[in-house]
Amino acid sequence: MKGIADLHIHSRYSRATSKQGTPEYLNLWARKKGISIVGTGDFTHPEWRKELEEKLVPAEDGFYCLKEDSVLEESREYEGEAPRFVLSGEISSIYKKNGKVRKVHNVILLPGLEDAEKLSKKLETIGNIHSDGRPILGLDSHDLLEIMLEICPDGILIPAHIWTPHFSLFGAFSGFDTMEECFEDLTPYIHAVETGLSSDPPMNWRFSALDRFQLISNSDAHSPAKLGREANLLDIEMSYQGLYKAIQEGEGLEGTIEFFPEEGKYHFDGHRKCHLCLTPKEAEAYGGICPVCGKKITIGVDHRVMQLSDREDGEARKNKKPYENLVPLPEVIAASTGKSSGSKRVQEQYENMLKKLGSEFDILRKIPVEEIRKEEGYLVSEGIRRLRTGQVKKSPGFDGEYGTISLFDPEEIENPNGQMSFFNEWEREKEPGIQAVDSCISGGLTQKKTEELSGLSVEDREESVAEKQKETIQQLNEKQKQAAETIARRIAVAAGPGTGKTKTLISRILYLLEERKVSPGEITAVTFTNQAAKELKERLEKQLGSRRSVNRMHIGTFHSLCLDF
């Protein structure tokens, strides 16, 4: 049977997840997406296992489906066979090995609820499995694999998102350099690895040590709507053994559906707090130290792959599987309409498309563009055509900030940006006081255009900040321009009256707003007099076309700012 499998997800019992992470909604969204096999996620959590036992019934060997009386009425509106569930869960192992603290995530698949119960009981003697659907255990990955094999020889352990900097097998901060260093004598029992959102198959093909492993992809979804953002293409016997052969031996594993790796939040190097994104070579030139604040740069997936790879490209790998880069359909609709992907209009159009044309994956991958155009018009169909042919613009993610993918140029649609942001705000885990970073320094800054910049909507101004900033920068001499655009930790401007110091300062602020995407609330400008502060505010208001952003900045004398704080 040909189908799509997403095996690594999380229920509502994991931290930072949707309340809709229930069997009912997983079933609903798997139908919408066109997914045949869904991992249950979080099998170690007692309450989740209890819920699974109550709401699932056995289907094919090792697979389950939702009980008929648990199926949401809405689910019946979508065609296709009921999706199957397979027992899955993720374990976070934090332990010391070879003189270094290791933090590794592993996904486990099991053939049934009884095996999940036995393994969970054993893990409960080692650590707390009640507080989080993805338990954190002080358990060596080698020992976790050994315990699993003793309790359930047919279990499958897959190192999860193997390149993620902080919690993975090859992570730059707390991982290993080789599979053998992690799993030792049990390495032969590892047959597959999960590439993760920030890497794709070609990046992994560059590391010959991975040639003997199957490369699989999953969504790691924290809400049902995120199912399938990465997934596996299968042609297998519909059973756990069929799935086992695909993952362990590659028999029936026909390829993967991938995120654009640039969109992953750890693709490039950088420092989110300083709004700094760097290529691996640029990060090395800075010695791994942020030139703005002097702290360590977060090493991204692309850099870590470069460190361990032994090939210039992956063409030498013999058993390569096909892969497809996709983005969710609501984001294509949003990009073509100029609306937010979460807007009512986009959601209504999304639902209508599913009911008229078929599942989301069929629309994105199979249905002829002409048929889509006939039903939905030019822009949506053109967006899908470009997606299928790889005609996208990419702005890479870094240090925990997701990258962005663009399908349209500004002049192609009514919306002035045509850019997509693929994650709802609640799903972006931001530290207090740290704003989303959307620019990237890469031999010159890559500009991201946004519909709303720093609280100032497009309609509120006649000219964009980008145009004003460009115009202002062009009026500076070389030394003034250097001061305005530097990424150095500090810059001193020594000049007499009438030499353009205020103009340079204004240019610096505009540069931070537009090129570095710094929030106005993070900008402080100190003046010697109240009159100078007033003049600075007035000139900024003139440049920005509104007071809103200026009022969010901290502009004043030293004493007035101290009083405000």
Annotated model-derived regions:
Residues M1-K2, L28, P46, V57, ...:
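C-terminal functional module detector
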Residues K2, G21, R49-H191:
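Extended substrate/RNA-proximal surfaces in nucleic-acid metabolism proteins
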Residues H8, D42, I108, L157, ...:
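Conserved, mostly hydrophobic/aromatic
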Residues I9-T22:
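Active-site mouth loops of central-metabolism enzymes
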Residues R12-S14, T40-R49, I94, D115, ...:
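Active-site environment of divalent metal-dependent phosphoester hydrolases
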Residues T17, R49-E53, F167-S174, W205, ...:
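Histidine/acidic-residue-rich catalytic or RNA/ligand-binding cores of hydrolases
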Residues W29-W48, I156-I158:
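Divalent metal-dependent hydrolysis catalytic cores, especially in the metallo-beta-lactamase
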Residues E463-F565:
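P-loop NTPase Walker
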